[in-house]
């Protein structure tokens, strides 16, 4: 960016998972950063400690001196800061456009797909960090190795997850992309699945002629768009058609071990068959960059996932795991990973649906996602600013789950969920808190409660 023109950058919703990493990178590059959010959080405290000025609550006064205003997809047009910025003639841009600006001066590696973006981005960043690449990395979750959502590197590469939710990933200019999967999601923005597929085709074709698109050949929706991709394609998966192929895949001690081409064998550090695919995407990208397989293997076998990705919050006689899963496909993957890892233990899933629109569009799929837990607890919907939809609620979902023969409870809020758990948990239980809303607070509360009981 032209520093003579842009010095002060304001972020509306600066505490959001997609926003704070970009803000941190810009802080580290010497820009003056201000921001606003609805509540305090450890993320906001970290940004303040790095030099950002952050306001709690949205006000016209917050933007008056900004050179540009960056907003997240959660910010509505009637936000007072958005309105004031436009009145003052201050440019307002979505976070994806600011990310694209950061990528413009780098070789971009953009990780896309309906699921697994944060983990795959973290894996690629971890592998490249073990080489001389020293990449800049921006992810949607806090990675333990960085202590934050972002790392400013000195190398020529920028690795980021790309957000398809509002189409802003089409603003990026990546050299290499990965498409891990395509699923029906973000119904408020896309008309249907075909509309989503078209966006991913456009995304893949954004890479230059010397770039590449790594794609999951085992995902039927991804496979269906291959004829329309006009760039080099690297296919990964279990299929014999894959360029980067996993075979002899087996479960050992709750984690997957597999062989890749004639490169060698990997024993993943993170559970779940979905993470085999995330690892294959990573291998495809890093192999394209001529990273030695021994470096890839060591990095993946010692990889520690981002926050809220099968994050163990408490481990003793009872296990508490927190996960961001909020789509039926993600829920099934996380619950399957838990069953693989904790074979004979009772699993209790506590799920907080996220957005009425998502629950409405995928109601049956959500209801069928809970056949693995021994007990399921469903809370009321976390609205994320949406208005309620008639006959769409956590209580209705619990009723539908019960129709499929599963043991389910409905609670209206997290406090009720906590009280219920305290009454039913027993030695040996594995508790998973699942969702993209405030459900993570319950995992912290439970971890504290169980620690104090020791």
UniProtKB/Swiss-Prot annotation:
Listed transmembrane segments: none
Q: Which GO terms describe its molecular function?
A: ATP binding; UDP-N-acetylmuramate-L-alanine ligase activity
Superkingdom of the organism of origin: Bacteria
Enzyme Commission designation = 6.3.2.8
UniProt-listed GO biological process terms:
cell division; cell wall organization; peptidoglycan biosynthetic process; regulation of cell shape
Instruction: Write out the annotated subcellular location.
Output: Cytoplasm
Kindly name one Pfam family recorded for this protein: Mur_ligase_M
Write the record's keywords in alphabetical order, separated by commas.
ATP-binding, Cell cycle, Cell division, Cell shape, Cell wall biogenesis/degradation, Cytoplasm, Ligase, Nucleotide-binding, Peptidoglycan synthesis
Q: Which GO terms describe its cellular component?
A: cytoplasm
Please state the pathway this protein functions in, per its UniProt record.
Answer: Cell wall biogenesis; peptidoglycan biosynthesis
Q: Where does ATP bind?
A: 113-119
What does the UniProt function comment say about this protein?
A: Cell wall formation.
Per the record, the similarity remark reads: Belongs to the MurCDEF family.
Put simply, this protein is called UDP-N-acetylmuramate--L-alanine ligase
Q: What is the lineage of its organism?
A: Bacteria, Pseudomonadati, Aquificota, Aquificia, Aquificales
């Amino acid at each position: 960016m032209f520093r003579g023109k842009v010095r002060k950058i304001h972020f509306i919703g600066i505490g959001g998972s997609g926003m704070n990493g970009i803000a941190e990178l810009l802080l580290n590059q010497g820009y003056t950063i201000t921001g606003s959010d609805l509540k305090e959080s450890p993320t906001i405290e970290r940004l303040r400690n790095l030099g950002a000025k952050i306001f709690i609550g949205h006000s016209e006064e917050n933007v008056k001196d900004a050179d540009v205003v960056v907003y997240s997809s959660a910010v509505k047009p009637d936000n007072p800061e958005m309105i004031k910025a436009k009145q003052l003639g201050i440019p307002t841009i979505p976070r994806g456009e600011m990310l694209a600006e950061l990528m413009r001066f780098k070789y971009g590696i953009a990780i896309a797909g309906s699921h697994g973006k944060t983990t795959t981005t973290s894996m690629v960043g971890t592998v490249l960090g073990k080489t001389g690449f020293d990449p800049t990395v921006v992810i949607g979750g806090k990675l333990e190795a960085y202590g934050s959502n972002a790392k400013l590197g000195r190398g020529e590469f920028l690795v980021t997850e790309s957000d398809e939710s509002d189409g802003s990933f089409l603003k990026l200019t990546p050299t290499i992309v990965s498409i891990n999967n395509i699923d029906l999601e973000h119904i408020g923005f896309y008309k249907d699945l075909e509309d989503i597929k078209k966006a991913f085709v456009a995304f893949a074709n954004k890479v230059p002629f010397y770039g590449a698109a790594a794609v999951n050949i085992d995902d039927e929706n991804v496979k269906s768009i291959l004829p329309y991709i006009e760039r080099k394609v690297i296919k990964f998966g279990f299929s014999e058609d894959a360029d980067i192929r996993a075979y002899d895949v087996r479960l050992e001690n709750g984690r997957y071990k597999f062989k890749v081409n004639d490169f060698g064998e990997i024993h993943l550090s993170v559970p779940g068959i979905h993470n085999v695919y995330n690892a294959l995407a990573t291998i495809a990208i890093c192999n394209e960059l001529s990273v030695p397989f021994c470096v890839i293997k060591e990095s993946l076998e010692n990889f520690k996932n981002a926050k809220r990705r099968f994050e163990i919050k408490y481990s003793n006689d009872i296990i508490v795991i927190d996960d961001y899963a909020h789509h039926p496909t993600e829920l099934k993957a996380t619950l399957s990973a838990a069953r693989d890892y904790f074979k004979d233990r009772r699993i209790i899933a506590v799920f907080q649906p996220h957005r009425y629109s998502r629950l409405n569009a995928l109601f049956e799929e959500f209801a069928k996602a809970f056949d693995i837990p021994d007990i399921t607890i469903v809370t009321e919907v976390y609205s994320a600013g949406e208005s309620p939809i008639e006959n769409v609620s956590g209580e209705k979902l619990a009723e539908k789950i019960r129709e499929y023969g599963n043991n389910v409870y409905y609670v209206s809020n997290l406090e009720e969920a906590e009280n219920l758990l305290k009454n039913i948990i027993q030695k040996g239980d594995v508790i998973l808190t699942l969702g993209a809303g405030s459900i993570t607070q319950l995992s912290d509360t439970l971890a504290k409660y169980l620690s104090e009981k020791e």
